[in-house]
Amino acid sequence: MVIIGPRGPGSQRLLLSLLLLAAWEVGSGQLHYSVYEEAKHGTFVGRIAQDLGLELAELVPRLFRVASKRHGDLLEVNLQNGILFVNSRIDREKLCGRSAECSIHLEVIVDRPLQVFHVDVEVKDINDNPPVFREREQKVPVSESAPLDSHFPLEGASDADIGVNSLLTYALSLNENFELKIKTKKDKSILPELVLRKLLDREQTPKLNLLLMVIDGGKPELTGSVQIQITVLDVNDNGPAFDKPSYKVVLSENVQNDTRVIQLNASDPDEGLNGEISYGIKMILPVSEKCMFSINPDTGEIRIYGELDFEENNAYEIQVNAIDKGIPSMAGHSMVLVEVLDVNDNVPEVMVTSLSLPVQEDAQVGTVIALISVSDRDSGANGQVICSLTPHVPFKLVSTYKNYYSLVLDSALDRESVSAYELVVTARDGGSPSLWATARVSVEVADVNDNAPAFAQPEYTVFVKENNPPGCHIFTVSAWDADAQKNALVSYSLVERRVGEHALSSYVSVHAESGKVYALQPLDHEELELLQFQVSARDAGVPPLGSNVTLQVFVLDENDNAPALLATPAGSAGGAVSELVPRSVGAGHVVAKVRAVDADSGYNAWLSYELQPAAVGAHIPFHVGLYTGEISTTRILDEADAPRHRLLVLVKDHGEPALTSTATVLVSLVENGQAPKTSSRASVGAVDPEAALVDINVYLIIAICAVSSLLVLTLLLYTALRCSAPPTVSRCAPGKPTLVCSSAVGSWSYSQQRRQRVCSAESPPKTDLMAFSPSLQLSREDCLNPPSEPRQPNPDWRYSASLRAGMHSSVHLEEAGILRAGPGGPDQQWPTVSSATPEPEAGEVSPPVGAGVNSNSWTFKYGPGNPKQSGPGELPDKFIIPGSPAIISIRQEPTNSQIDKSDFITFGKKEETKKKKKKKKGNKTQEKKEKGNSTTDNSDQ
């Protein structure tokens, strides 16, 4: 039980002091519990709340808690029932070691008032640790001469438990040589010992393995064991002995000096020095001044120490002995009989003279390489010598005289296949057994320049980014020559040719020794997409041989050209363009179209359009097509809209980084009926000085005059046809095609058949004109009876050379209605140049080069991008004058009709009939002009 503070009678002052002590000072009290180690989690220890005199309901309010400086997580209190329980595994040996007493001290703290209680929990030991030995095996050396009752101490076991659980008992496995004895030391600890009860013999039992077991006194008992390995030490009590009392050996008289005669073998059952044997020769009979034999003292190997001669001695008797190294030493004896046989003991001799080396690989068959002579000191059949040569070689031996031979060339040589030959000349006598001798002849083959340098492949493809720095290393060619030395020394050079107007050497160079190819100047993808040339490799032989390899260098495009705005009718790209727009137009009305080109290709030439932030306001009713460049109204115009708008259109490509240009469009809003009959661009020039038109060139004036004349004729014919039409034909019904006129430049045709039109009092039906190339033959029957199927695009429509530089413009792709993926950009389907499109859908022209499609023709196609879907027999809103880059949209408007829309148009000044050289010069001039206009436009921003 816990005694909380001393109690007794006292005055009021004493009671007050006790209350203060209870509230502010630490109260004292102590509890004692016990628990066994290794108890499971949740094991009951004691009702600590009840023993401390605390109610269960006040444990939480008074912040009942257990604090311990060490091992605080081993025990825990359940605040619901006030029971102290085991929280985690308790290991007494880890907690207290081998101490006899082991307890866990806890401090229990409660507040309101503050009280501290001390709790000691005794940890009781259980037999959870078996006795163990420090090592798994103990080695005990014992001499075989050790006397009986000899004691050999062993290392005892240890038990981590205490008390009875640590009391140990030893037991030894059964054997006839040793018994176990327990020795008690001064500290009351016990030590096991082995006592020898029977003498040992190492030759019979060199080792003895015993098992020592130990048992503790716990319940249940735990055991341990250790292997006892007894090694019996040797004593020199045995002498060496040979495996045979005598040996017999037969030798030929021609055996070489130091030849092994026999290997003797003696054994000693002892070990160590007692078993180490040393061999020696005691006597050799017959006695001679020269010792003909020697013996190795360590191995017992007998070798010849001189030359045996059958004519001198035909037999020898060798007496040998073996002595161990024990103390005292012991010896064994034996005898070796050697019999000598008479044989053919003289070998032939071979001599090679007059060598002609090295041999040229182009040497003639039959060329003498060397002279060979042979001899043998024997006589008779033993002295007759026959020579032979290594087989399967391009050489042979030719006998020239007795015992003389010539080594000659038998077949053609090839140094690249075999550069040297190791020939073996064998001379064999006629003895029995025959003797032979060999001589080696090394024949080197000298190189002849018969192999040209060879490349790994006949052609290489190299990719180089444009705008590379001068002297840039772009590739390395390597050729291999199978010849040797200077015949294999390869040098590289360019195979000179013309690349356009320049020499190949002005573009690239090749290092003569390394084969590295360098670009001498920055390459321009727009000027040169593919550079194909050959590199020659020649060796230094006489005469030199060579070969060529082809290199195809593709110049990869980089975004180094900003979008260039196509020239306005005034003749300057990037200048302000004025447009007049009636206020009565509805949403989606196209005001103008911005046209731009990019000299790059691929993504670098894919253009997008957007209004500059300065031009985008909350009330500006205009929007530009992302990929079409068409500026259209976003809503119906009203009186609140400003009469004039200055729009800045940003044209941006998709390169990395993107390059931009800016176009300025001036839009003036006019009331209905106030639009002048002349071109909106011309009228705006009088209103706004910034949009004033420049002088129109002579060709444009002539074209407009011709078109105006044709327009008047068309109107007259149209009026006649309308008056003669049946009354059943509605004003909005499709009309029949009518042939207007025919001229040297083509046929002009008018069509209203199958035309989807809108009947409106404000906007009467409009008629379209279109110009076809002269190759299109139209008859009146064709015009009056259009085919039921849609017409295929005319393959004769072509862009002139003056606009070849603009073939990469993505705006033309958008005009053609081919950007069907919307803003998806890269997912769009690029148009082809085929004129056999099965079902054209919209009246625009599509550039075949804008997205990397290589062609110089423009094909008329229909697509969903056209706001008006024409019927199969109808003509589009725009026409192309053959031989001119202009795309002209001409519509016949009634007197009070409003101007529908205007386009940015370009008229070329170069004719297709000019020479090719002049075309290139004109294209370069126009490209420079467009770049200058782009720069001017950027400065306007």
From Swiss-Prot:
Task: State where composition is biased (Basic and acidic residues).
Answer: 900-914
Q: Which SUPFAM superfamilies match?
A: Cadherin-like
Keywords, alphabetical: Calcium, Cell adhesion, Cell membrane, Glycoprotein, Membrane, Repeat, Signal, Transmembrane, Transmembrane helix
Q: What is its main location?
A: membrane
Which stretches are Extracellular in the membrane topology?
A: 30-697
Question: What positions does the record give for glycosylation?
Answer: N257, N265, N548
Q: Which GO terms describe its cellular component?
A: plasma membrane
State a single Gene Ontology molecular function: calcium ion binding
The record ties this protein, via Pfam families, to: Cadherin, Cadherin_2, Cadherin_tail
A GO biological process of this protein is: homophilic cell adhesion via plasma membrane adhesion molecules
The UniProt record lists the Cadherin domain at 30-133, 134-242, 243-350, 351-455, 456-565, 581-678
Which regions face the Cytoplasmic side of the membrane? 719-941
Superkingdom:
Eukaryota
Query: What is the recorded membrane topology of this protein?
Result: Single-pass type I membrane protein
Q: Where is this region: 5 X 4 AA repeats of P-X-X-P?
A: 734-885
> What InterPro entries does the annotation carry?
Cadherin-like_dom, Cadherin-like_sf, Cadherin_CBD, Cadherin_CS, Cadherin_N, Protocadherin/Cadherin-CA
Query: Which parts of the sequence are annotated with region: Disordered?
Result: 818-941
What PANTHER family does UniProt report for this protein, alphabetically? CADHERIN-87A, PROTOCADHERIN ALPHA-12
UniProt function note: Potential calcium-dependent cell-adhesion protein. May be involved in the establishment and maintenance of specific neuronal connections in the brain.
Q: What is this protein called?
A: Protocadherin alpha-12
Q: Which gene encodes it?
A: PCDHA12
